[in-house]
């Protein structure tokens, strides 16, 4: 029988024998095999019995044959339904609507304690409902405590008083020389300045570069800052007291609050000044729709309750200032005042770019509260580099408040190219914008807020169980949106986005791979136009990339590592002998836009935008690689992979895998478009060398030894975002790579690392929950309070982190974190397959969801854009659902087959290359049975508009059989090493760990088994890294069902009671009903324990789980029974290493996954007794404290504590 080829099978035919309920848990499906048997049984039926039956069977045969042909076509691509570990068959049904996720109030409340693990959160706050971040601490100016405003074109970092320009004056860690500086390459003093998109200067030399010799062949390009447009100041009593960032001291300020609304991008600052006599409130915003408009609102009022008895009036001079000294790397073109319009203006040019300038035009309205009469400026000043208007007002008890609205038009040459009135000068347009806005504050504010609200209607992420993660998702969206725009972007220039956006000159404001690989993909599913604008910048600089290749004698094109105004090869951005992978990154970003397929992205885009970039990159790499006749493979040389700790190496793994993948893209796209395809591309793609150790661990580069410390994700990038895996052998190697390199990341490395591990773990591991522990590891060490901005480093102290002054804010991390949710936890990937007959590319969406035990209730991605359709992606506790909510075109979805994954089949080194140790780390797994057939493909679906596809979530197995603690909630009661998170100790991954900050003091982890899930611990195991502890103790909090019920009910009562009297009465009745006596005492006689330490543990527990309850206990003595003491069931058990130390590891020649040390223990309850003799109910517990102290080898210079990889507790 001739097989009919069809890439997509018919959705209706696919589910004729399935239960169409959207809930798939515990549903049975007969599968393809049973349907094949039915077909064969029909074909053997005796047709002679009845002519009528013959006719009926004839018709039925036609129908069944059609089904069989469709089935055969499917089987060409997938036998995934035969996998015993996971049934990927889904149900397509009419859309059920919004899919509200379950809300777990206890998990949500507990998650709020995670904020306290953020750096500098002690005086910060977050209003969840209104999305407001803020601080009550008036501090000296330091970058991490400053918010900013931006709209994708203009931006300004806001100092402590709420407006103006300020240099940093505080470093938390040291006052060493350079402590207040930014990092490479400028190494200049950090400042709260103002910036304009694409306003680049040219510098003959920079303070720090990688290739200074290239300064002789081309200037470097870095961002210039413009005069600070938020600069308002006021002075009192003949200018004897000034209110500006330079003159306001810590002692002058009380009742301080500064907050950032992520709903609308407004920064509000309020404070009392001068013995609380004056109240100052400011609001700053960059108009979301009118990009060249910045607005400052300032209210100055008398606090009448704090005025002296002889107070009469207060003279105030308000200064609207433009000061050239607040800009950097610019030349002053002109400055002046416009007395007719009460305005000041200034024009600056970026250094060495006379063809560009930026004009700033500022005008104010000044009115008393409840007055309609504006006050005109009384004086104007024009100095050499400062222009100002002065408004004199008198505050009295009858007129106690003055309101200033400052409207600033900002126009640069780069933005003016997009305007219809291109003949207008920049100053003319800036003036028009400011004057048209003047006096329309409320109307402008309303339109500004509406523009922000409209943006959020296009994108939303829900994580109901975790306030911190949801806030981080929201803040990441906010920060990326604040620094990009989807219109008013020149198509022939695009949108260059620097690492720190529009509020900082970190990394010189230059464009790195951060824009292509980290930020753009995070925006693409929600804001494809913004992503395309960012990619258009690479299109605009493509012609220069071709000149770069020509300069070095290569065909094709070579992008430099850094770009700005131009994309020439510079000392910061060399084109050769450095990070060649940038060419893969740019190509991947462009191809991803095609695979996403938003409006207008079709074969024309592929032919005229993506194809030239990929073709030229393929041409360059074809000439660059060298054939090694001894290996019979192609090699690369003298390069740097993403791990910048290793420079000038050969055969970088990610670079070579990128070349392999890119050459495949070039072949596939060329064939699809009917273009000429170089046969050499396929040959090199097939035969490029990826270095591996004898144990099949991918080496980051040729000659790598085991002493390596990795700066950032490198080899793991082959899994995501590159998608290098294309057969089972590579998949198995990738799993080993994930394990190996997870233990070799620098503790102080950049925040772009662990989002990649989230995606890799979710896609590669069938056990544990490390995809979620990596998610926390992506946030907790890097996110900075109070304004939820990411730092580049987990440790901001340049004296302890390798002399790195972190970029801030680090938008790269915002993009990475969003990708870890959008693509990591959901398993979503843009993908394609090639029809083997026509060579045509067919775009599809891969969906590979897993259960998320650390995130009860799941996650929801609202308004995901794909193929110009709008989707909701829902991961709840049992099912994954894609809802086709808007659009009129079906989409193609593929569910991969996870039966290929063998994440436990790891053989460990045993001191000999020829003998492998039996798998000591092999974790017990409950297998239903081995898969009937390995299949690298999956199951395909066609999802039509107003339908939804629901698939059963893959349920990862337990790492260790019957481990009651795995995937449960955990918190560290003592400090850990920067970059470590406690979740790693229970995540079912033997290659993640938590490590105490020091080895001297006792370190503690507190585990919560969950509500109504108390267990009696009988035995367990601690899996150590190469650094075991000296001893271990375990304590439990004796618990009972009565206590559990009271615990939950008291919390509910607290949330619903309206006043203290009602609260006390209700709790009293609850305790009476439960039989709790007025004087409730629990007998702990006979138990030797450290009372103070036990009480501290209880206090920590209450603070973690129920902070309000801890306060309530102090008010209601009868609740003291909840302060049960922890009972020590394992006391200072000494630890002995279970594994030898291999000499090959010491001499750095060993590239192996080493077996871990372990300590097993059993609990002897006969030596313990609590309460009445014979009573064993106390042994059950929900809360456990695991304490470790010291390290086994206490003679090294490392002050950090033991490495705890996994805690296993059995009942």
Swiss-Prot record:
It is a single-pass type II membrane protein. The keyword Hydrolase applies. GO terms for molecular function: alpha,alpha-trehalase activity; carbohydrate binding. This is Periplasmic acid trehalase ATH1. GO terms for biological process: carbon utilization; trehalose catabolic process; trehalose transport. SUPFAM superfamilies: Galactose mutarotase-like (SSF74650), Six-hairpin glycosidases (SSF48208). Keywords: Glycoprotein, Glycosidase, Hydrolase, Membrane, Periplasm, Signal-anchor, Transmembrane, Transmembrane helix, Ubl conjugation, Vacuole. Residues 68-1211 are periplasmic. Substrate binds at residues 513-514, 711-712. It is found in: Membrane; Vacuole lumen; Periplasm. GO terms for cellular component: cell periphery; cell wall-bounded periplasmic space; fungal-type cell wall; fungal-type vacuole; fungal-type vacuole lumen; membrane. It comes from the Eukaryota. Glycosylated. Belongs to the glycosyl hydrolase 65 family. Pfam families: Glyco_hydro_65C, Glyco_hydro_65m, Glyco_hydro_65N. It is an enzyme of class 3 (hydrolase). Glycans are attached at residues 98, 207, 238, 247, 255, 259, 325, 370, 376, 488, 539, 568, 628, 638, 696, 705, 879, 897, 910, 972, 990, 1031, 1049, 1064, 1147, 1157. It catalyses: alpha,alpha-trehalose + H2O = alpha-D-glucose + beta-D-glucose.
